[in-house]
Amino acid sequence: MIVFPAIDLKAGQVVRLAEGDMDRATVYGDNPAHQASLFAQAGSQYLHVVDLDGSFAGRAENREAVEGILKSFPGHVQLGGGIRTREAVSGWFDLGVSRVVMGTAALKDPQFVKDMAKEFPGGIVVAVDARDGMVATEGWADVSDVSVVDLARRFEDAGVASLLFTDIGRDGLLKGVNLDATVELARRVDIPVIASGGVKGIDDIRMLKIHEGDGIEGVITGRALYDGRLDLKAAIEMAEA
């Protein structure tokens, strides 16, 4: 199982939001590249980066910060946030991003996401962001009438690398991962699932690890790391055991 430390970018700074609310951002630093190198020093080979401004704008808004991260982090970088055109997808791969995360595009234009998954094998992750079991888009501002499982199943034969499942109601609040919903999704869909939202400590890693065989590929953690509630090295060791 993979542990993805998260770097969320807002106006070039490292931040964490509460429930995806841009007005409830906590700033953790103004040097994303340095933060990425700290995660690498702790043993991380994977990183999850989100261009928050890009999520709302529908285009790259923190390109310079992302490029700095790519230069300072020797491992695999998974990037999301406003990536909705072929030019954007291919451009990020050219710069060294390992996987691109697509959320709003998956709901609004599923064929486009399938085309990208075909063109860039193993490179496309579909973000399934949920509020009370229903899919949310546009930086989580809009809630659709599509269920998480229904959206996920649309991509079962598309060749996407993973599903990134986020429970918005827990994100950035340290409430603990929504284990039941995450495991249920992993069991019902034939695509590996990455858990996100609410990680508060090592117990979340332990519980997800138990269900690795159900299709849990990894877990994303942000605030728990920044607040010192979760030791990254210990989390990686447990996940890889």
Swiss-Prot record:
One GO MF annotation is: 1-(5-phosphoribosyl)-5-[(5-phosphoribosylamino)methylideneamino]imidazole-4-carboxamide isomerase activity
Q: What EC number(s) are associated with this protein in UniProt?
A: 5.3.1.16
GO biological process per UniProt: L-histidine biosynthetic process; L-tryptophan biosynthetic process
Q: Tell me the enzyme class.
A: isomerase
Query: What reaction is this protein's catalytic activity?
Result: 1-(5-phospho-beta-D-ribosyl)-5-[(5-phospho-beta-D-ribosylamino)methylideneamino]imidazole-4-carboxamide = 5-[(5-phospho-1-deoxy-D-ribulos-1-ylimino)methylamino]-1-(5-phospho-beta-D-ribosyl)imidazole-4-carboxamide
GO CC terms, sorted: cytoplasm
The biological pathway it contributes to is: Amino-acid biosynthesis; L-histidine biosynthesis; L-histidine from 5-phospho-alpha-D-ribose 1-diphosphate: step 4/9
Q: Does the record bear Isomerase in its keywords?
A: yes
The question of whether Transmembrane is a record keyword is answered with: no
Its annotated compartments are: Cytoplasm
Name assigned to this protein:
1-(5-phosphoribosyl)-5-[(5-phosphoribosylamino)methylideneamino] imidazole-4-carboxamide isomerase
User: Which species?
Assistant: Novosphingobium aromaticivorans (strain ATCC 700278 / DSM 12444 / CCUG 56034 / CIP 105152 / NBRC 16084 / F199)
Name the gene for this chain.
hisA
